[in-house]
């Protein structure tokens, strides 16, 4: 976001008025510029490098190309644009203590900033709905939300985000009418984001608060359903272990099927926790800024300018966090290690250890040529299927992975979660 439209002085730089000697002041300014320049450069590098790594991993490894990870790619693209087109110019604005790119780029830069934040929160909202459908309608999930439908949803998210960010700013609907704001709009070297009260409140609600409320509500429902599933799995396993040993010996597949059912759902719930961390981190990083964004137009000079800028940069830093959070996933972690040449090709299992059948499902062959003998398979069998109906213990609370919809299509829940 641009700098706030209030009358505070720029306080992130050292204050020269108290310096006893001009040379000392210049040295202090130079040291501050160098230190902040290095810090901001590291932030930009972390954002760009991390999100390029995420996008490359999903593009290269077919096992990661799931519906949910399509949305993760959209989120990474928003963070990447933030790191390439927003944060560097914000850093220059701070370090040079003035805007040097002209009025047009000032408004365009601000529009891109709003676009990235809006696209991120709306994508997180879509991910919450995606997981809600996967948890509550496992029979129909892949028929309800195919990869082509996911692409359409992503396109709609970016179109809506573009309209809500570029249109009001490029049409100047955001502009305030007081003298200081008018003078800033006319100066090529001023890029403080002076806004009128209706725009500040409406844009914050549409771009952040409304999607946030939807995301929190839907995801709370997802966790409630997931918690009930885990409780039913525990009860189911208890009943299974209480069965006669001879019955298990007569049908050895029942034990394998029960273990695979539990393992699949436990892995899915771990993925839900990872997505919850992503959403929680985004909220913690951006919520303070959007609170201040409304407060400062209601009560001018209540929020100091340096506080506004620091909270804005806290939001920027969030773009570097997501790739670190994805490392919770064994699939992503191994993909990152292979892309960085930190391990030998263990993801050969994506192609060599798996074979596709006529229903476009992936079957684990039992051999993963990418793993060396004795190496721990920390990917948790990257090609492992969800529990099949043939192995399924039909008890309350357990859900088979396959179903046939009304048109006769096979709807499998074989979707790698992060």
Swiss-Prot record:
This is Beta-2 adrenergic receptor. Expressed in oviduct epithelial cells with high levels during the luteal phase of the sexual cycle. Lower levels around ovulation. Also expressed in liver. PANTHER family: ADRENERGIC RECEPTOR-RELATED G-PROTEIN COUPLED RECEPTOR, BETA-2 ADRENERGIC RECEPTOR. It is a multi-pass membrane protein. Coiled coil: none annotated. Residues 59-71, 130-150, 221-274, 330-418 are cytoplasmic. Residues 398-418 are annotated as: Disordered. It comes from Bos taurus. GO terms for cellular component: apical plasma membrane; ciliary basal body; early endosome; Golgi apparatus; intercellular bridge; mitotic spindle; neuronal dense core vesicle; nucleus. Pfam families: 7tm_1 (PF00001). Belongs to the G-protein coupled receptor 1 family. Adrenergic receptor subfamily. ADRB2 sub-subfamily.
């Amino acid at each position: 976001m641009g700098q706030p439209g209030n009358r505070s002085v720029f306080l992130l730089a050292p204050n020269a008025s108290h310096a006893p000697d001009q040379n000392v002041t210049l040295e202090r300014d130079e040291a501050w510029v160098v230190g902040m320049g290095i810090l901001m450069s590291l932030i930009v590098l972390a954002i760009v490098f991390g999100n390029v790594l995420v996008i490359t991993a999903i593009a290269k490894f077919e096992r990661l190309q799931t519906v949910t990870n399509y949305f993760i790619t959209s989120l990474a693209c928003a963070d990447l644009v933030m790191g390439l087109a927003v944060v560097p110019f914000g850093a220059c604005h701070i370090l040079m203590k003035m805007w040097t790119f002209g009025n047009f780029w000032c408004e365009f830069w601000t529009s891109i900033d709003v676009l990235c934040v809006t696209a991120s929160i709306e994508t997180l909202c879509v991910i919450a709905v995606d997981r809600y459908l996967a948890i509550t309608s496992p029979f129909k999930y892949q028929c309800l939300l195919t990869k082509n439908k996911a692409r359409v949803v992503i396109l709609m998210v970016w179109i809506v985000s573009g309209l809500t960010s570029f249109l009001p700013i490029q049409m100047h609907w955001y502009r305030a009418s007081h003298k200081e704001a008018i003078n800033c709009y006319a100066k090529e070297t001023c890029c403080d984001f002076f806004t009128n009260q209706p725009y500040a409140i409406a844009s914050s609600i549409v771009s952040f608060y409304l999607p946030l409320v939807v995301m929190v509500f839907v995801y709370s429902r997802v966790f409630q359903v997931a918690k009930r599933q885990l409780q039913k799995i525990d009860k189911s396993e208890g009943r299974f272990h209480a069965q006669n040993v001879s019955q298990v010996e007569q049908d050895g597949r029942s034990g394998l099927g029960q273990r695979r059912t539990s393992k699949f759902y436990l892995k899915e719930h771990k993925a839900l926790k990872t997505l919850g961390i992503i959403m929680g981190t985004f909220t913690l990083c951006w919520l303070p800024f959007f609170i201040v964004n409304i407060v400062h137009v209601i009560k001018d000079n209540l929020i100091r300018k340096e506080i506004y800028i620091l909270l804005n940069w806290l939001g920027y830093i969030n773009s570097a966090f997501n790739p670190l959070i994805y490392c919770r996933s064994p699939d992503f972690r191994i993909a990152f290690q292979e892309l960085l040449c930190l391990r030998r090709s263990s993801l050969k299992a994506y192609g060599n250890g798996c074979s596709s059948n006529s229903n476009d499902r992936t079957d684990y062959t039992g051999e993963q040529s990418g793993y060396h003998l004795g190496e721990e398979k920390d990917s948790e069998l990257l090609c492992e299927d969800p529990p099949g109906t043939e192995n399924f213990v039909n008890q309350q609370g357990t859900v088979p992975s396959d179903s046939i919809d009304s048109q006769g299509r096979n709807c499998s829940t074989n979707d790698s979660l992060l």
